């Protein structure tokens, strides 16, 4: 059964950095969730306007469908970056064919802010952090996953991530 790892958290938490490092270790398909947004969603976020549930649903469904397609093609693992802020959003992703795990990156907020302020050319702005924090719901008991609070270097975070993956007995 395909093991899907959703690297989740608010903007600037390091999702892409961790996902790319995981992809190098697991040699599996990787989807950058930002690439699945419509231009309208990107424009909205770029203007500092938070997305609503209606904006997010088709985006989440496209990610879910990509995950299921990878499972149908025999992928052992997949890695997806996605904020996955609400339980209801994660429920959509959990409909994918295979087993879905959430790796919630939750470094201190100042680390997120610093990363966001140093980004060049990304549509998300540091001003979006608060709206994402307001929306964020912690993982629930019915959701498989781990919360990683480290603000360390990417390789330190990867040790924790791979510890979780290996504990699943599926690496």
Question: Model segments located where?
Answer:
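Glycine-rich phosphate-binding loop used to anchor ATP phosphates in small-molecule kinases
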Residues: 54-97, 105
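The conserved Walker
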Residues: 11
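Hydrophobic anchor at the beta1->P-loop junction of P-loop NTPases
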Residues: 7
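Walker A (P-loop) ATP-phosphate-binding motif of ABC ATPase nucleotide-binding domains
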Residues: 4
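Conserved substrate/cofactor phosphate-moiety recognition/catalytic segment
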Residues: 20-62
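Conserved phosphate-donor/acceptor-positioning beta-strand/loop module used by diverse small-molecule
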Residues: 96-115
């Amino acid at each position: 059964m395909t093991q899907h790892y959703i690297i989740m958290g608010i903007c600037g938490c390091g999702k892409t950095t961790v996902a790319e490092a995981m992809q190098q270790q697991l040699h599996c398909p990787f989807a950058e969730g930002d690439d699945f947004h419509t231009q309208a969603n990107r424009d909205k976020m770029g203007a500092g306007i938070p997305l609503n549930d209606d904006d997010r649903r088709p985006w989440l469904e496209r990610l879910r469908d990509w995950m299921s397609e990878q499972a149908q093609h025999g992928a052992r693992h997949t890695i997806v970056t996605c904020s996955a802020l609400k339980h209801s959003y994660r429920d959509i992703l959990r409909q994918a064919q295979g087993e879905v795990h959430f790796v919630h990156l939750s470094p201190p907020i100042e680390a997120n802010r610093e990363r966001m302020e140093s980004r060049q050319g990304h549509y998300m702005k540091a001003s979006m952090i608060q709206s994402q924090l307001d929306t964020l719901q912690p993982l629930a008991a019915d959701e498989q996953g781990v919360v990683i609070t480290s603000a360390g270097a990417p390789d330190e975070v990867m040790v924790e991530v791979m510890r979780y993956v290996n504990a699943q007995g599926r690496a």
